[in-house]
């Protein structure tokens, strides 16, 4: 057939592509319904399983330690620490789903529709809550350093309300996954877990992808760029060396988040534009998108275990807090404790909770 002159709709008019949806979690294509025969359905599945297993172990251990250190230090807990506590909780909840995703890479989705919805929801909530919490941290740092404001963020009930609101908004943004994900069975391939919106799939895809990505990624990203831009300018102008050093942890956390999730978001945007025919779809482009989705998804999954490593290597206060816990329980000598062991990851904050 002539790939240049005919559209895919004309070439495959007799086929039903209403359920042909590219999931962020499981097989990006189903050979019996896809307009192109994929060159490669997925990255080597056993390689992916090994990565998932390592991320699961590192995330489980690392985020548990982060939560332990923050929860143990009630007196010196800063506003930023509360946000980081919720960030660790989100990563930990997602990590608990990784064994299920790993098994599905080998055997297909054998866990039914209920678990399909639950683990997909946890992944989306982890993504949205992560960037929303980072946006809140950027606002907190902006108020504390640029405006020297303490009154807005030092009240405990307000910080708790903000965190609860972030979880609620993240659930709302992830609601399409909860509503439309299900186990899909197709001939010649293993069962899969992905969105199924029936005959309205094409009509809803743009709305259900672009809106959550806009409000759950682009808007918080713009907030962070604004806040950290002015924060950095203030730090350099005032030569606030100590606070500048304390901000290294937060900047590292934000940078790692963007490096892990921005590529996936861009590829998902390209996939959405292609599926809604804003960008012409060809077999070559389809295969490139498939491979990019697989690769960038793995990069995003890696993020759930990286924050504790940042705290361990860059966050001096986290190391001090962990050593303090070990000393209290007699695992190390108290003489090895540093003089300043306040367990706040980022130094002074705009308030304490």
Curated annotation (Swiss-Prot):
InterPro entries: CCR1-9-like, Chemokine_CXCR2, Chemokine_CXCR_1/2, GPCR_Rhodpsn, GPCR_Rhodpsn_7TM. Disulfide bonds join 116-193. Keywords: Cell membrane, Chemotaxis, Disulfide bond, G-protein coupled receptor, Glycoprotein, Membrane, Phosphoprotein, Receptor, Transducer, Transmembrane, Transmembrane helix. One of its GO terms (cellular component) is external side of plasma membrane. Its main location: membrane. GO terms for molecular function: C-C chemokine binding; C-C chemokine receptor activity; C-X-C chemokine receptor activity; interleukin-8 binding. The keyword Cytoplasm does not apply. It comes from the Eukaryota. It is found in: Cell membrane. GO terms for biological process: calcium-mediated signaling; immune response; neutrophil chemotaxis; positive regulation of cytosolic calcium ion concentration. PROSITE patterns: G_PROTEIN_RECEP_F1_1, G_PROTEIN_RECEP_F1_2. The keyword Cell inner membrane does not apply. Glycans are attached at residue 19. Residues 1-45, 103-117, 181-205, 271-291 are extracellular. Residues 73-81, 140-160, 229-248, 313-353 are cytoplasmic. Signal peptide: none annotated. Gene3D superfamilies: Rhodopsin 7-helix transmembrane proteins (1.20.1070.10). Pfam families: 7tm_1. Phosphorylated upon ligand binding; which is required for desensitization. It is a multi-pass membrane protein. Receptor for interleukin-8 which is a powerful neutrophil chemotactic factor. Binding of IL-8 to the receptor causes activation of neutrophils. This response is mediated via a G-protein that activates a phosphatidylinositol-calcium second messenger system. Binds to IL-8 with high affinity. Also binds with high affinity to CXCL3, GRO/MGSA and NAP-2. Interacts with IL8. Interacts with GNAI2. Belongs to the G-protein coupled receptor 1 family. This is C-X-C chemokine receptor type 2. The gene is CXCR2.
